C-alpha cells in the first residue's frame, strides 16, 4: 500500500512521540530501542555523534550524526525536533556489510542558543531509525564562548631582597571556556620546565622560590581562550641587595715610630655592595686606636771584669756582658768580643826550662801523690766492704720515706747528709761534695773524676775537695770552646727570656722566671765524661715565623732549648704553658719542631702516640710536658675540630699611675692565658708607666668566627666624658685565634671634666659575639689607689734560672735510686712502676714508660717536672710506701716471689 509523500512527516511525528515517551528525552548517552521480535544486530549504530561546541562571536556551529544501518536520522534540540528542511542528509551503503548508511548535518546559530533562558543549557541529540528499532546519540551542548576584559586580580609591583621568595597572584577574567593563564617576563614566556626556580600554582599565581638579580623584570599575566587573549597590567619586580661590610684591613703602622701614636684600619661596603636600592652598611668604615711603639735600645758593654788569676798556661782572662743596657726592641747588638785573654807571669806559671832542683822536687811530689792514692784506695775498699749490704732490699720502708727531705733552690747547707752539690767555674774545675754516699756497684772505684767518675763513690763523711785531673791544655780548650762556639756566642745573655748553665751527668734544671717554662735534665741524660752548656730561650712570635695552616692556632709559647745536635742518653723534659681547653672531641693537637733547614714539622700528634716515637707529651689543664732526646725549637699547635674548641684568654685592665692631663686611658689587654704572655705585658706596662686597676679575668674564646667586642658603660657624665665615637670596639677573630700577635688590646679614652676629678666609677664589658663574656666594675681613685699593684709585684718575683746537680731535684739521689731499683722489675703482686704511675695519675701512656730502659726513672722525672719547687714529698713517699702490704713492707718482696 503506497503512502502519499505529504503524510510522512505526520507519521514520523507520531512514531517519535510514542518512542520518546517510552524511553525519556533527557538521555545524554546513546540509547537503543529495539522493536519486539526484531534482530538487535540491525539496530542503528552511530559512527559519528554530535559533540560539545562553542559559538565564537556570531559564527554558527555544525553538528554531525552518522549511523549504520539507518533509514532515518533526525536532530532534536532542547526537546524540540529540528525541522526536516534544516537537515542536510547524505545516504550511502557500507562497503563491508552492505547496510544502508546515513549522515545528517545541521547548523546551530547564536540566536537559537540565546533564546534559552534560565539555568538550562542548549543541547542537541540525534535519533536514528532502522527496521529493528531506534537509537539515540549522546547530547551535545552548545555554548556561547566569551572572555571578559577585566582581570579579577592583577599582579602588583614588589621589592624583595636577594634570595627572598616572590609570589605574584593572578585571577584571570571570567570566560567560557575558562581561560588558560601564562606569564611573561619582559615579554618573554616563563617556562617552569626550563627554570626550576619558578612554578605556577593552580590558582595561576607565579612563585619564585629564591629571588635572583636576574629576576628583576616586568611581569605580565596573560589569559586566553578560543575567543580572545587578555593581558594584565605589568608588575615591576625589583630584587635588591643590602650592603655588607668587608673584613677589616690590618691595622696600619703606628704613626709614631717611637712612643705613642695612632693606627687605623678600614673596611668597605662591598661584601656585597648595595644594589637596586638596597640599604647601605651600618657602622663606621674606619677605626682608630692608640698605639705605643717601643723605642729601640742599642746594646752597650758592661765594664770589664777583673783579670782572672794567672793560669798554668801563663794566661789570664777577663769578660764583659752586653747588658749596660742590653739590646731590646730591635736595637743593635754590642760589637766586639766578650772575652779577652793575655799572657801573664806568676809563681804558678809553668816555665819551659827546669833546673835539676826542680826535677828532684817534681819526683818527690809524684812519689807522695802515689802513696796518698794507694792509701786512699785501701780505705775505700775497707769502707765499701763494711757497707756492702747497703743496696740490698730494705726491710722497712721507713728507710725509704725518711730520706725524703725538702730541697730548696737556695745554696745547700752543711747539715744535709744526702745533698750533693756541684758549682762549676770556668776558671777551675773544682767540685765540692759533702756527705757519705755509696751506690751498688760490682767493685770499688779507685778514684773519682769529674769526667768519668761514679756519682756515689765511697767517700768519707767529711768535706772533700776534688780537683779535675785533666791536663792544662784541656782546661784551656774548654774555656776557648765556650767563648768561640757559634751557639754560645749568639746567646742573648742577661735577658729575662733566657736561662743557661753548664751541666754534666749529674743533670739539673733551667727555668725562665715568671713564664712557666723550664727544662729538666735528669741524671745520666748527659753522657759521663761530657760537659754541655745548655740554654733555654723564649721567643717572641714576631721573631719566629711559624706557618699555621687552615684553622690552626698557636696554643703555647715558642721555646728553644739547645744547642741542637748534642748527644743525650735519656729524655729531657721541657715544660711550658698552653691556653687550650683540652678535649679530644674539640681539638687536634700537634707538637711542632723546627728542623735544621728552618722548616716546621709535626713531630707528635697527641692522642696517636706510639712507644717508637722519639717524643712524648703529657698534656694537663694548663701546661704540657715534652719528653725529648733531641733539643731544638718547639711549639704546641691546635686545630679546632668543632666550634666547641675553646682557648683561654686572660683579660687585664691597665691605666696610668700618674695622670697629668685631662685625658685618661684605660687599656684592656686580651692575652693567651699563659705566664709568658702576662710577663710580656707587665714589662711593657712598666715601661709605659701603667698600673693594674682590676683583678685579671679569664674568658673562654670559641672557634665560632665571631669577633671580640669591648665596650665601656655607666661613665658618670658629670665627671667624665668618653671620647669613643662608636658604641663598642672590636678585635677581629683571626687576630686572636691565630695566636701570633702580641699585646692585643683596645684603649678607652676618657676626659675629665675638671682637673680635680680623681674618682672613677664605670663598667667595662668584654665579650665574644654569641659567646662568653666578662664584666669589670671599676671603682677607684686614679691618684691614690694601688691595691692591685701587689699582684704585679708577686708576678714579677724572679727565681734561680739554673740549678745544677742534686739541688735541682726534690727527691734525694739515693732515695731515687732505691725506688728505681725496686720498682723497675715487674712484680705479679703489683709492687712495681705501673702501680706507682696509677697512684700518681701518670698512667695515661704506660706504653711509653715501658719502652724506656727505666720506666720508674721516667715517672720520677715527670713528677719532678710537674712539682718543682713546691711538690709535696710526703704525698710521694706515701704513694711509694703504699705499694706493698698494709705493713708497708714493700721492699721485703724478694725477686723469687716476683
Swiss-Prot record:
Site (Cleavage): 396-397
Location of the Ig-like C2-type domain: 155-234
Tissue and organ expression note: Restricted to central nervous system.
Keywords linked to the UniProt accession: Apoptosis, Cell membrane, Cell projection, Developmental protein, Disulfide bond, Glycoprotein, Immunoglobulin domain, Membrane, Phosphoprotein, Receptor, Repeat, Signal, Transmembrane, Transmembrane helix
PANTHER family reported in the protein's UniProt record: NETRIN RECEPTOR UNC5, NETRIN RECEPTOR UNC5A
Recorded family membership: Belongs to the unc-5 family.
Protein name: Netrin receptor UNC5A
Gene name per UniProt: Unc5a
